[in-house]
Design a protein with these regions (language model features):
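Class I S-adenosyl-L-methionine
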Residues: 1-108
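C-terminal target-recognition/interaction regions appended to catalytic cores
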Residues: 65-183
Length: 183
């Protein structure tokens, strides 16, 4: 069993590390020996203050997929909705749920902000800000900062679970690079 002598934890927001998503996670960093423990410094901020880059918005992350045709090999799998549901989506304002009172389901994404936390539960959490449909696995993967050459395997629902359960790539990279400097 490994025993750590020094442990420090901090709440980190993925958007502060170049991820187009406001996903907050408590990150623990520990060392076996005495020494200073720090967490990675942010590279981005909400308004780009303190010489940091501005947070990346949903639109910046996925704009080029708006009119892209379905491509199963690229994980850009479109969902076909019935006309009644498509009309509901169309009439839902940005920042609101298609179902009104549900704060976390079928939320119409705000294009000019980072997204809410991408989760694995029910694949229709994010409604596209422009198109009357839920976001594709590839769009959600981009919100998790996965590179386009990372291909998810399995059914669409299994892809959504993999994407939603992942640590955002940009945050993981920032933490790993910082820990490497501490060694």
């Amino acid at each position: 069993m490994v025993t750590f002598e020094v442990i420090k934890f901090k709440l980190l927001n993925s958007a502060n590390y170049g991820v187009p998503q406001k996903r907050e996670r408590v990150i623990f960093i520990g060392k076996k020996k005495n020494g200073k423990i720090t967490h990675p410094e942010p590279t981005h901020s909400e308004n780009g203050e303190d010489r940091l880059k501005k947070w990346i918005s949903i639109k910046e992350a996925i704009w080029d997929l708006e009119d892209k045709e379905e491509d199963i090999n690229f994980n850009h799998i479109l969902t076909t909705h019935n006309s009644e549901f498509s009309e509901k989506i169309k009439n839902t304002p940005i920042g609101k749920s298609v179902f009104g009172n549900y704060s976390d389901a079928f939320f119409k994404a705000h294009p000019d902000q980072p997204s809410r936390t991408v989760k694995e539960n029910h694949g229709g959490v994010f409604v596209h800000y422009k198109n009357n449909r839920v976001m594709t696995p590839r769009e959600l993967a981009r919100l998790q900062s996965f590179p386009d050459d990372f291909i998810f395997e399995g059914s669409k629902s299994k892809q959504l679970v993999q994407i939603g359960n992942a640590v955002p790539v940009g945050l993981a990279r920032a933490i790993a690079e910082h820990i490497k400097k501490l060694l």
